[in-house]
């Protein structure tokens, strides 16, 4: 049976463009209460201090609230039980970018990323060196673990370290904990692929296991900012960095619009979905179709991939698309503080490409 998926564009328009009285405007991934609060704080802060202040305040809200335990401290520990943070902030005016990845023992990842933008000529700082940079700026060093994360690790180890992110090692990572040793490469592995690539995309994305807030801000001057904050994949190999802090992967913005992504970051970062969605909007594609194209080009290679993209263009139109998630919610906020949460059905592995060739447009 054929299934069709609708991409909603429910937003106040006047003669095809958004009413300027609605600006600033913010769109964020995920529809839970913490994300709604972050969305409202972002639009309020944008009115007070501009698009970058609004972006950072919104992301920082989710960090403090530990949104769905997938943002901020006390979530998604690595194999060693340590929680590390990633964040990205982008200002479309001048393409200014700051990011941190694998940030240890500092809670304020988004503010540190903003510090990279404002106080260095770099784009991305990583690991312990990023922590030292944060301390130079006056950020407090503290343990990001909680009793809950410690219990997760304990349970994970008693369940033979399942799931994990190892492959082609011994003992069998699908049934045993490490330490692991690499298996000898066969001839076919050397010349073709270490594993069937479809096995690389099986990271289940859901409400408590999605790892990211992605946000796009459009200010009163119609200029965009965009960013992310994340504590990464749960039980990841220490040192792992996903899509969230990578410009064009986790988020992207220019004068034509902005986009943000969430989901299986190890796969998504290979396709730069946020950059792709924005460039599609630059070519005149509506946000819903731009997000849809960004998702389906990943599904063509990784049918089991799960994730989502939200997008907003310079006319104030919004759109979203998702794959292999039961339901994906996202928020839109306006100048008056109203936050509207939408929920869309997602493309599925078994039928996403066979029948549906393009998103259904509204408005």
Curated annotation (Swiss-Prot):
Stretch forming the signal peptide: 1-17
Chemical reaction(s) catalysed: N(4)-(beta-N-acetyl-D-glucosaminyl)-L-asparagine + H2O = N-acetyl-beta-D-glucosaminylamine + L-aspartate + H(+)
GO molecular function, one term: peptidase activity
Keyword Glycoprotein: yes
Locations listed in the record: Lysosome
EC number: 3.5.1.26
Biological processes annotated in GO: proteolysis
UniProt keyword list: Autocatalytic cleavage, Disulfide bond, Glycoprotein, Hydrolase, Lysosome, Protease, Signal
Disulphide-bridged cysteine pairs: 161-177, 322-346
Any matching Pfam family: Asparaginase_2
Subunit structure: Heterotetramer of two alpha and two beta chains arranged as a dimer of alpha/beta heterodimers.
PANTHER family registered for this protein in UniProt: L-ASPARAGINASE, N(4)-(BETA-N-ACETYLGLUCOSAMINYL)-L-ASPARAGINASE
Protein name per Swiss-Prot or TrEMBL: Putative N(4)-(beta-N-acetylglucosaminyl)-L-asparaginase
Native source organism of the sequence: Caenorhabditis elegans
